[in-house]
Amino acid sequence: MPKYRSATTTHGRNMAGARALWRATGMTDADFGKPIIAVVNSFTQFVPGHVHLRDLGKLVAEQIEAAGGVAKEFNTIAVDDGIAMGHGGMLYSLPSRELIADSVEYMVNAHCADAMVCISNCDKITPGMLMASLRLNIPVIFVSGGPMEAGKTKLSEQIIKLDLVDAMIQGADPKVSDSQSDQVERSACPTCGSCSGMFTANSMNCLTEALGLSQPGNGSLLATHADRKQLFLNAGKRIVELTKRYYEQNDESALPRNIASKAAFENAMTLDIAMGGSTNTVLHLLAAAQEAEIDFTMSDIDKLSRKVPQLCKVAPSTQKYHMEDVHRAGGVIGILGELDRAGLLNRDVKNVLGLTLPQTLEQYDVMLTQDDAVKNMFRAGPAGIRTTQAFSQDCRWDSLDDDRANGCIRSLEHAYSKDGGLAVLYGNFAENGCIVKTAGVDDSILKFTGPAKVYESQDDAVEAILGGKVVAGDVVVIRYEGPKGGPGMQEMLYPTSFLKSMGLGKACALITDGRFSGGTSGLSIGHVSPEAASGGSIGLIEDGDLIAIDIPNRGIQLQVSDAELAARREAQEARGDKAWTPKNRERQVSFALRAYASLATSADKGAVRDKSKLGG
């Protein structure tokens, strides 16, 4: 029978000092036999996805206390990728994931907490907390802040939906007037919550449902809607039940590694491919799997990508649908239901509610459930009122979107495409693979060949694009922007957005050892592995080299002879300590980022730390 971890600090005469300090936090004698549950919040006023979380930790804590636990809250950092985008701040985004994971480990282990409720939302916060949860392997429930409502404005006599990416594209488009750009900017992000499309934050919050670590509705129920409050209340009650099941009944099924099994990871990736999620999710799932000591690799993702169709299409891949529309169609469970009926899921998995996949679908799939309360929850919709307050409205759609032929979520028979929304490509400069979000690629450029325009920083590429130096047919290559080479593996949302604003969105390709925002669409291929800074062949590409991209056949090829590549590699190695570094880039790199770079692996490993360098 496992012993409560917290007993280390609450029992025994030699812990008198620790108990004295616990008493100073408000604990009493009656609390010293109860489980201590960490409420891991991420409130900050810097990030719209987190600005409303201040009081939500208290909601969870009250339920923990009422159920017989002791709640202790702390905060992690949270970086807003959109605000950090396009300047040196983006170097810090991915490294913040490791800091978040480590800080959760530090706090939970230092104070011997027994379990956790993780209140996350945006891009690196959910992955960082997920990594920590699987590393620590103590009972956990995730409950995120929820998606932002889509922006809406009137353009050309039509009401259109908007998001952050629209503001960026219009702001860079010389054909758009100042007044229209300002109108879009003011309308794009109307409420608190994670940006309204199927970007990285919402993709990851959806995947926690498929992993079984959050409740149905977590990924899609709007941040502003009153119904979302129930997820927080339920999380506080349920975590105490899970904690007691493990520590008092020796039930290891309550532990996250037994919930988020390899079968669950395969389901999560299947969901991601079907819903056309952000390419960043690949990076984060690979990292989380390593923390869970699960053998889940790019090879597994490649196999799934070849058999899973695209059943959902959401911004940025279309302007018709945002997360509020996914929710109306049944949310994550709605997509999982269609995948299950297609025979594409592992059914022998459970979630934090203790339900098997078939039980979850029977109760929460809008195409199956007889529960009017569940149907009502999925009718929760936007209010269209600017606010930074959680649970501030209770508007509902008149009806559910259960049209699986033409609606937001499709059945297998009516899939958007037989190929899924993500693909892994391999070739002679991506020997370990690279990732493309096929959901955002126009059919006309699924096969593409063009000459390379090579840049050794995102800034140089942006300058060239806006300066008219990139023309239709070019393949823009941005290298030395990987985890080690950046360092920090910057997102390339500005280059892809500016290609669109210059009318080149369907006329050019962009390839990088960096990564892309969840808001990226177009022929944008990232995560090239090995990265240039690790001796990857992307570092050997020269201006004018022809690059052939073949998404249907999962290929990407530099059309240069092996002999020529060998000669270029020899010349690169001859640079000595300057080998595999940019030739003409001046970038100030802080000691914090240098420390990150010294241990970083390439994207095919999830950009996690190289444990071999740490004796692991």
Curated annotation (Swiss-Prot):
In this UniProt entry, the residues modified to N6-carboxylysine are 124
Question: What's the source species for this entry?
Answer: Shigella sonnei (strain Ss046)
> Record's InterPro entries?
Dihydro-acid_dehy_C, DihydroxyA_deHydtase, DiOHA_6PGluconate_deHydtase_CS, ILV_EDD_C, ILV_EDD_N, IlvD/EDD_N
Please give one Gene Ontology molecular function term for this protein.
dihydroxy-acid dehydratase activity
The UniProt record gives the binding positions of [2Fe-2S] cluster as: 122, 195
Q: What domain of life does the UniProt record list for this protein's source?
A: Bacteria
Q: What is this protein called?
A: Dihydroxy-acid dehydratase
Q: In which pathway does it act?
A: Amino-acid biosynthesis; L-isoleucine biosynthesis; L-isoleucine from 2-oxobutanoate: step 3/4; Amino-acid biosynthesis; L-valine biosynthesis; L-valine from pyruvate: step 3/4
Q: Looking at the keywords, is Amino-acid biosynthesis present?
A: yes
- Enzyme active site: 517
